[in-house]
Amino acid sequence: MVEKLQEQMYVIPLGGVKRVPRWRRSAKAMKDIRAFLSRHMKSDDVRLGQDINEKVWSRGTEKPPARVRVRAMKLEDGHVQAELAEE
């Protein structure tokens, strides 16, 4: 079994998605979440949970949330697993 090395909570701002066309905003939000976690957790292999995907796409492609609260775990094999934080 793979052990987790580091666990961190982040509130990821998604204000930058307002600068892209409306029909592309949720896809851009998913890319921004992955890039944020890659930068802060120092890993290129980031795996997002299905619950994050459902939260971002819940209001369609034109209206993603302004911010997402995420729990990220860096595992000993080097990849980062992210899940939506319970509120």
Swiss-Prot record:
Claim: Ribosomal protein is one of the keywords in the record: yes
Family matches, as InterPro entries: Ribosomal_eL31, Ribosomal_eL31_CS, Ribosomal_eL31_dom_sf
Keyword Ribonucleoprotein applies: yes
Domain of life of the organism encoding this protein: Archaea
One of the GO BP terms on file: cytoplasmic translation
Record's keyword terms, sorted: Ribonucleoprotein, Ribosomal protein
Gene3D superfamilies named in the record: 3.10.440.10
GO cellular component: cytosolic large ribosomal subunit
UniProt GO molecular function: structural constituent of ribosome
Lineage: Archaea, Methanobacteriati, Methanobacteriota, Stenosarchaea group, Methanomicrobia
Similarity comment: family membership: Belongs to the eukaryotic ribosomal protein eL31 family.
SMART domains: Ribosomal_L31e
Protein name, entry field: Large ribosomal subunit protein eL31
Organism: Methanospirillum hungatei JF-1 (strain ATCC 27890 / DSM 864 / NBRC 100397 / JF-1)
SUPFAM superfamilies named among the record's database cross-references: Ribosomal protein L31e
